[in-house]
Every structure is written in structure tokens, then in C-alpha cells.
């Protein structure tokens, strides 16, 4: 698998004007949705970048979505915007209330103030093809902005509009996918109004997938499925993803005995106990499975582990009475049950005092590697290591023959390498190419409908 990253660019940041603002300077017409070069008067780059965004249905929708802060648990406003936008464009929209996540939310605040958005044309109340992505983002909120790489200027009076860089939280993950899916769907319905297309935008993907779980457990997730294709939107560099690694989380807790650090033999250090355990755990992806390691595969490579959080002790002059660590596992093969057994065996083998060690696996969110469909021509294909909402949607096709199973595709603009960073962003060209990519996937799915 080849991995492509965006080359660093010396960007000139520009503050975004409101969509209603326009340059008062005379200028030649701006080409918004076709033609790469845009003529601009010298010294007016900022106002003309705004004009390019405002004159494109795709880019203006993406801007509106990205300007609404929607960190997980705060998706209500972006949901309201989507409902209004989709209804205005002829969709029937259902709001599916989803309770807030997490212990940090007071019980009195747990009323459903956010919701999944499920939409379909009035003529197709039972979609056969569903495009889906998520509307929540990770923190912190970073305002939407535009910039023009120096290489995008072809002279004093023109720029390469496809190179315009769009930055801000959610511009990649995953509001780019949301905007591109909507525009591709609208475009297809303009010429094929009877195509049974549906849109599903969920909350809470970044914090465990409660939104998709909620949809999956609802009557909207029909059994057997009335749909035959689901197109998931995530940043995949506009490549079709043939699968992603599985996921497993666990905690290690060690109990020690406190004592004065001048007399450590009077106590038992929980930190000294946990260190060799974590060293063993950390190496499980590099140990052959036949020797007690976690599985690897030709498709996904090695299983990887990340010891993300460590805690222990209270002061340097106290022998630590407790220590703990939290670990994430990206599974490249095998089952969740086998992975748990392997981890428990490794912890036991590295423990000096096994009775003081406890391993707890997260109650939810564990799944093996997820294989996806990649049978549509015209795409580069790759695998990814990150998790998605794909396994959170339990599609009820388990008892169907292979030819009747639901196709699942994963595709979208932008790179995961910047998705959660302070430099999150993508180009106009990335967005426009992805609309065509989604359109190609829709056409392939329509062809499947016609063959049934």
C-alpha cells in the first residue's frame, strides 16, 4: 500500500468574510464549478477567494457546515442546519434524538439536544442506496479559513482555484464528506429523480459511535435490509478503502503497598510491577502469533498497540500503592476473543504478583478487522488503520446469500493524517474530485439495483 501525504505548503492565512459580503471592486466573472483558472484583480485575493466559495453550491455548503461548531455532544446546531437545508431541497427528513455521551454530563443535562439526520426524497421513502457520515468533530474548535498557496498563483491576474486551501476543525473529518455526499446526491436526483437514495448523518462517531448504534437499533435499520448499498464517508484521500483494522481497548490496574521511599522494602511498588507488564504488552504486535503474540495479516500488516495513558503514585518519597495504564489495540487479524486471551496470557507471564494485577476490557467498541467492498472501477484502493462507524451499524444480512448481502463502501476527501490536528484542511480540488467519486459509487449502486 502506498501512502500519500500533502506536501507542506507555505500558506498565507486569510480570515473568512461572511458569505453575504462581496468585493466592491470591478472584476471579471469567477468560474466556480468549472474551469481551473479564476481571473482576479491584483491585490484582491481575499475577497475573490470568498467569491469562489460563495458561487459554488458545494463549497458554500461545506463552509456553512464547517462554521458551525459541532464538537461531540454539541451537534444540535449543525443538525438543525442540515434539516433546513435538506428540506429546502425537497427531502423528507426524520430527526432521531440521541442522548448525550459520557459521565462528564450532569444527569439533568442528558436530555436529547442532538439528533441523527435521516433524509430521503419524498418519492423514495425506502432508500436502497444510503450515503452516510458523521457531523460531530473532535475538540478544540478551529475557525474556518481560506488560504492560497504561492504555487496556486499563475500570474498577477489569475489563480488556480483547485489549489485554494480550506482549513478548520471538521473541514476534513468529516464535513467534507457530508457536503460532497449531499451535492453528489442532489446532482444525481436532478437527472434521475426516482433513484431510491437516502442520506444518514449521525452524531457521536468520535466518542464511541452512539449515534450509529442508536440508528442501528432503531426500526429504520430494517430486517432484512430494504437497502443494498451503504456508502460511508471518511477522509480516505479519495481512495476506495478495502478494509480497516479492528479495535480493542483495555486497562491494566496494579495494587501495591505504600511505604516511605527511604525504606522501599517495607512496601511494594505498583509502578515497578506494572512496567514489565507494559513492556510485554507493548511488544505483542512484534511477537509471532505462534510465540504468544497478536496476529498479523498480509492485508493489514501488524497488530499495533498504543499505551496512551499511564498513572501511578502520589509523590517521589512514597512507594506507589497503585498504578494503571490504558491501552488501545488495532487488530490486524483474528477475533476479539483470541486477542483478549493473548493479552491476558502476556500480562500473567510478566507479573511478579499476579494477584495484585487486574485487566479490564472495555464493554463496547471492540471488533475484529472490517473488510469492505472495493469492486467499483476507477479508484485507487487502500486499507486504513483508523476506526469508523462501519462496525457500529449492524446490517441484518447475516442470513442472506452472498449475492444478497449489503455492499459497504468507504470513501471520502482529505487525509486522516491532518484530520484531528491543528492543520486540518484540504483543497478545493480534493472536494470537487470527491463529488465525482461519490457520483461514480452511486452510479455503480444504481446499476446493481437495475440488475436485481
UniProtKB/Swiss-Prot annotation:
GO terms for cellular component: extracellular region. Zn(2+) 2 binds at residue 173. The keyword Transferase does not apply. InterPro entries: Bact_exopeptidase_dim_dom, Peptidase_M20, Peptidase_M20_dimer, Peptidase_M20A. It is an enzyme of class 3 (hydrolase). Binds 2 Zn(2+) ions per subunit. Pfam families: M20_dimer (PF07687), Peptidase_M20 (PF01546). GO terms for molecular function: metal ion binding; peptidase activity. Zn(2+) 1 binds at residues 173, 206. It is found in: Secreted. Its cofactor is Zn(2+). Its EC number is 3.4.17.-. The keyword Repeat does not apply. The active site is at 205 (proton acceptor). Residues 1-17 form the signal peptide. GO terms for biological process: proteolysis. Keywords: Hydrolase, Metal-binding, Protease, Secreted, Signal, Zinc. Belongs to the peptidase M20A family. PANTHER family: ACETYLORNITHINE DEACETYLASE, PEPTIDASE M20 DIMERISATION DOMAIN-CONTAINING PROTEIN. This is Probable carboxypeptidase CPC735_001200. It comes from Coccidioides posadasii (strain C735). The lineage of its organism: Eukaryota, Fungi, Dikarya, Ascomycota, Pezizomycotina.
Amino acid at each position: 500500500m502506498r501512502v500519500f501525504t500533502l506536501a507542506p505548503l507555505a500558506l498565507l492565512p486569510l480570515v473568512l468574510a461572511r458569505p453575504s459580503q462581496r468585493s466592491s471592486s470591478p472584476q471579471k466573472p469567477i468560474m466556480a464549478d468549472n474551469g481551473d483558472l479564476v481571473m482576479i484583480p491584483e491585490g484582491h485575493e481575499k475577497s475573490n477567494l470568498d467569491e469562489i466559495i460563495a458561487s459554488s453550491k458545494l463549497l458554500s455548503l461545506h463552509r456553512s457546515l464547517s462554521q458551525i461548531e459541532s464538537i461531540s455532544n454539541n451537534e444540535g446546531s449543525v443538525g438543525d442546519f442540515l434539516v433546513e437545508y435538506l428540506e429546502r431541497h425537497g427531502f423528507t427528513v426524520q430527526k432521531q434524538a440521541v442522548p448525550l455521551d459520557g459521565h462528564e454530563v450532569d444527569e439533568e443535562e442528558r436530555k436529547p439536544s442532538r439528533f441523527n439526520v435521516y433524509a430521503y426524497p419524498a418519492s423514495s421513502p425506502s432508500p436502497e442506496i444510503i450515503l452516510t457520515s458523521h457531523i460531530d468533530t473532535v475538540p478544540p474548535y478551529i475557525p474556518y479559513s481560506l488560504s492560497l498557496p504561492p504555487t496556486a498563483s499563475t500570474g498577477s491576474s489569475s489563480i488556480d482555484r483547485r489549489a485554494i486551501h480550506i482549513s478548520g476543525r471538521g473541514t476534513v473529518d468529516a464535513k467534507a464528506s457530508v457536503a460532497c455526499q449531499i451535492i453528489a446526491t442532489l446532482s444525481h436526483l436532478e437527472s434521475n429523480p426516482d433513484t431510491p437514495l437516502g442520506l444518514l448523518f449521525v452524531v457521536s462517531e468520535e466518542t464511541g459511535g452512539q449515534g450509529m448504534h442508536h440508528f442501528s437499533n432503531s426500526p429504520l435499520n430494517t430486517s432484512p435490509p430494504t437497502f443494498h448499498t451503504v456508502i460511508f464517508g471518511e477522509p480516505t484521500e479519495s481512495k476506495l478503502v478495502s478494509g480497516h483494522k479492528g479495535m480493542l481497548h483495555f486497562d491494566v490496574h496494579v495494587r501495591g503497598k505504600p511505604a516511605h521511599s527511604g525504606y522501599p522494602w517495607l512496601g511494594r511498588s505498583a509502578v515497578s510491577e506494572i512496567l514489565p507488564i507494559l513492556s510485554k504488552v507493548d511488544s505483542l504486535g512484534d511477537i509471532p502469533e505462534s510465540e504468544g503474540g497478536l496476529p498479523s495479516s498480509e492485508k493489514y500488516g501488524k497488530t499495533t498497540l498504543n499505551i496512551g495513558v499511564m498513572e501511578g503514585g502520589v509523590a517521589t518519597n512514597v512507594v506507589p500503592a497503585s498504578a494503571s495504564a490504558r491501552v488501545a489495540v488495532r487488530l490486524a487479524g483474528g477475533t476479539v476473543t483470541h486477542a483478549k486471551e493473548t493479552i491476558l496470557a502476556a500480562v500473567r507471564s510478566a507479573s511478579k504478583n499476579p494477584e495484585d494485577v487486574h485487566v479490564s476490557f472495555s464493554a463496547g467498541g471492540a471488533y475484529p478487522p472490517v473488510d469492505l467492498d472495493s469492486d467499483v472501477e476507477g479508484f485507487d484502493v487502500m486499507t486504513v488503520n483508523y476506526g469508523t462507524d462501519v462496525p457500529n451499524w449492524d446490517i441484518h444480512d447475516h442470513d442472506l446469500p452472498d449475492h444478497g448481502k449489503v455492499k459497504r463502501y468507504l470513501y471520502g476527501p482529505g487525509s486522516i493524517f491532518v484530520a484531528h490536528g491543528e492543520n486540518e484542511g484540504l483543497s478545493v480540488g480534493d472536494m470537487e474530485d470527491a463529488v465525482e467519486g461519490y457520483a461514480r459509487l452511486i452510479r455503480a449502486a444504481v446499476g446493481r439495483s437495475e440488475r436485481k
